[in-house]
Amino acid sequence: MSLTERLIEEVAARRDDLVGLTQELIAIPTLNPPGDNYLEICEYLERRLSGAGFETQMIRAHGAPGDSDTYPRWNIIARREGACAHPCVHFNSHIDVVEVGHGWSVDPFAGVVKDGRVYGRGACDMKGGMAASIVAAEAFIAVCPDFNGAIEISGTADEESGGFGGVAYLAERGFFSPERVDHVIIPEPLNKDRICLGHRGVWWAEIETKGEIAHGSMPFLGDCAVRHMGAVMAEICLLYTSPSP
């Protein structure tokens, strides 16, 4: 049996565990706003991942928008190294879910299984993805205990409100730096067979163009800053005339 076949078999054997883990995560109502039960779900994940041999670290985003003693912004990062520290594959999922809303036919926090699907607030976005990451990592380690590299799994806060108390807070402190992480997989709900390059990062900048004021009757005596900005925008647009490779 090939390695791929062994992995597929191991994952299939954990199907019930995957469903159960998804249900247990759904049962922790991490609604955002306001940011309920972040500590509870991080502690749950800490128990699960440490039991699988991961070293875990819980990080509160002190001072981040929304963080307070009533609603602390907690995150968890778990790491397991094989024979070496690199390459490191990091699985990131957010722990928060949006408000419940109306029109439910089942308890939104029960994780009801019906017609082969798990129903509940966050089942798709993205506690199912988090559970899949954990079960996949555990299955891989069971088949390849002496793998080369490292696996990280994170549960981060506040994705539904900008991520300032979650991914952004951790990124500013080097948790996703190239020195630590080589690849990131984010199991957001797209399509079960769709894997895509979804995020290249962001570069924030302030660009200022300058001109010279003149009377509207004699614009040729001035220098229009807006026109210069238009030229800048035209050059920026040229960067996106074709898809990136």
Model-derived features: where do they sit?
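Metal-dependent peptidase/peptidase-like ectodomains
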Residues: 184, 193-228
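Beta-strand secondary-structure signal
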Residues: 75-77, 152, 204-208
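Alpha-helical metal-binding/catalytic segments enriched in His/Glu/Asp
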Residues: 91, 118-160, 209, 220-237
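Acidic/His- and Gly-rich active-site-bordering loop/insert found
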Residues: 2-118, 142-148
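Generic recognition of short, well-ordered alpha-helical segments
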Residues: 36, 40, 131, 165-166, ...
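A short, acidic/glycine-rich surface segment
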Residues: 64-65, 98-100, 192-196, 216
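Conserved small/polar residues in nucleotide/adenosyl-binding loops
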Residues: 240-245
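Acidic/histidine-rich catalytic neighborhood of metal-dependent amide-processing enzymes
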Residues: 126-200
